[in-house]
Amino acid sequence: MKNAVHFGAGNIGRGFIGKLLADANVAVTFADVDAPLVDQLSHKQEYKVKVVGSECQIDTVTHVTAVNSASEEVIDRIVQTDLVTTAVGPNVLDIIAKTIAQGIAKRFAAGNLAPLNIIACENMVRGTTHLKGEVYKHLDASLHAQADELVGFVDSAVDRIVPPAEAANDDPLEVTVESFSEWIVDEQQFKGEVPSIAGMEKTHNLMAFVERKLFTLNTGHCITAYLGCLQGHRTIREAIENPAIRDQVKQAMMESGEVLIRRYGFDREMHQAYIEKILARFANPFLVDEVDRVGRQPIRKLGMNDRLIKPLLGTIEFGTANQHLLKGIAAALKYQNDSDPQAVELQRSLQQVGVKKTLAKYTSLAEDSVEVAKIETLYNQL
């Protein structure tokens, strides 16, 4: 039986990556800082996943355990494991890099020269390549050549909506996920044998799929959230069932889709079907996904390589329509959430320096650009 160490025992870790690994007969050790969660997982060594779509089913995931990600034990697990995966959030990758580096160093010192593959499963472009840079900062330079030879840092694109568990459920380990899932990996970056895991698709053209997901699912999801907030909707489903919001979100995804079609040669009809599938996923009656969860961290989401600005830059590159994307960005600026430090910082900036300077600061768009002027106009109309 193959072994994997998975950083992040949260809903995505358990409901998506951990489940696919366990279903492929891989023994999964979750690593997390949440001590009660680690204790429950290591005690029960199984958990339930409720898969909801046109039909609902409950699967039991077995052969799992957990360790504290700040412990020496997780380093020892990396010494022996076949695979390391993560679902910790982009901001936490830099924190776990040191632990992974210590594990690699100890692995080499112990004489384990079997290939090790590491896959960051995060909502970021080339997240594993970023993680590699951070790991190498903590790895002695004398080990870099050996790591280049034996450790594969495999970029991936992941897609599955996993909302927070409902508090009414008395099983803290159970997680609800949608039936749709997509995990695409860059086949060229593996070292040694490429693992065979049902649900993990291999490709030589990862960026096409990374951007397809970022420009469609992520772009549409956050615009639904930001427009939904402005209309007083609580959940993504409520928001997308508002015809005006649904139309706006669909138009924004068609604008970003035009960039994908021109950049990567996606089939137009197939991409339109992909957009419709995503709209249907947002309306899934079994998923209670709050607009505040999807809209949180607006400063990160307004970054130049993220879900709003990157597709906009593509429309500028190809000279294509972008009015609905611009409106989505304006709606993001309107997002208010006192419990989200980024939302608070964004509102403070808008009050202190205004729309144009705030956009220039956080998005890298030029303050005097046509796009920034249009966003300011739309912002004032919302």
From Swiss-Prot:
EC number: 1.1.1.17
Gene Ontology molecular functions: mannitol-1-phosphate 5-dehydrogenase activity
The UniProt record lists the keyword NAD: yes
Example of a GO biological process term: mannitol catabolic process
Keywords for this protein: NAD, Oxidoreductase
InterPro entries the UniProt entry points to: 6-PGluconate_DH-like_C_sf, 6PGD_dom2, Mannitol_1_phos_5_DH, Mannitol_DH, Mannitol_DH_C, Mannitol_DH_CS, Mannitol_DH_N, NAD(P)-bd_dom_sf
Catalytic function, reaction form: D-mannitol 1-phosphate + NAD(+) = beta-D-fructose 6-phosphate + NADH + H(+)
Keyword check for Oxidoreductase: yes
GO cellular component: cytosol
Binding-site residues, NAD(+): A4, V5, H6, F7, G8, A9, G10, N11, I12, G13, R14, G15
Family the UniProt entry places it in: Belongs to the mannitol dehydrogenase family.
PANTHER family to which the protein is assigned, alphabetical: ALTRONATE OXIDOREDUCTASE-RELATED, MANNITOL-1-PHOSPHATE 5-DEHYDROGENASE
Full protein name: Mannitol-1-phosphate 5-dehydrogenase
